[in-house]
Amino acid sequence: MELNIIEIKDFDAKELDIYARLSEGQLLNRAEPEKGIFIAESPKVIERALDAGYEPISCLIEKKHIDGEGKAVLEKCDRIYQNTKRYSDAEKQENLVLKNSKENTVSEEKYALKNIKYKETDMSDFPVYTAEFDILTKLTGFKLTRGILCAMHRRPLPALEEICKDAKRIAVLENVMNPTNVGAIFRSAAALNMDAVILTNGSSNPLYRRAARVSMGTVFQIPWTFIDISGNGETYIGRLHRLGFKTAAMALDDNSVSIDNESVMSEEKLAIILGTEGDGLLKSTISESDYTIKIPMSHGVDSLNVAAASAVVFWELGNK
């Protein structure tokens, strides 16, 4: 089937709003996750999102990449898009048959699905918008990494209890607002065998374009969810304790112990809590945690960037 290549001629086309005029916050639409959209950037990130089950809506690609680096991922997007559409059509047909059937038997359901007819065409209806590099840069406001973007449907996030059910080692990001740091932490967490990442609601969303790109798509490979720290009722530290986790706050404190502390590393279920750039963790988080830990440093250096610090502590955990 031939790809549905659409050359961009009108910057104001409604279909391009998701790439040109909507903020990432508007795309994500946290209040209604079933309607939310995110933008994946680069072939590697898009492919990992597709492999994780996210459904594509459309692609925006630089012309020279259509038959080059972007070809395989465009074809994969198209296949998934068509399969999703057919599955949706089958569900609609099934519901219609069940509604109109007097007996609603299992055999009727199977017959209805088996006999759905699809219109075969030579042209895909998965939209692939394209233009030269300068036009795409002007449209989006930034230079596309590896020349391709893909708009995708987001999914409702799992509950904290589901994420933590079988986890032994998790990372908690408290108000980490920089998407580059969030992406780098996810990449380290995936590479160094952490089981999940939990984010407080003041943190950058891992599905932001830059966060997902910096993570190299690992935001689609490691389980994650948001946790509320509004202070209404039980604290998030309390929830983690209730789920069987000991908590270790990364902070410079008179009571801090080294990350290789035997008691810390021997905990069966451990949550490493990392704080926002600059201010670090909330005092209440530190006081409620079971441990306060630090990375031993030299030459008068007292701290590392949160993404760098996370890689060190994840590696240390992996060696125990």
Spans of model-derived segments:
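Structured adenosyl-cofactor binding patch, chiefly the S-adenosyl-L-methionine
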Residues: G147-C150, S188-L192, P206-V219, K283-K320
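Boundary-proximal intrinsically disordered activation/regulatory segments immediately upstream
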Residues: M1-D67
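RNA substrate-binding interface of SAM-dependent RNA methyltransferases
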Residues: I6, R79-Q82, N100, M123, ...
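Alpha-helix capping/helix-boundary segments
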Residues: K44-I46, H65-I66, D134-I135, S203-S204, ...
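Intrinsically disordered, low-complexity terminal tails and inter-domain linkers enriched
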Residues: K71-S124
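Active-site/ligand-binding-proximal alpha/beta "capping" segment
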Residues: A248-V301
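A glycine-rich helix N-cap at a beta->alpha junction
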Residues: D125-E132
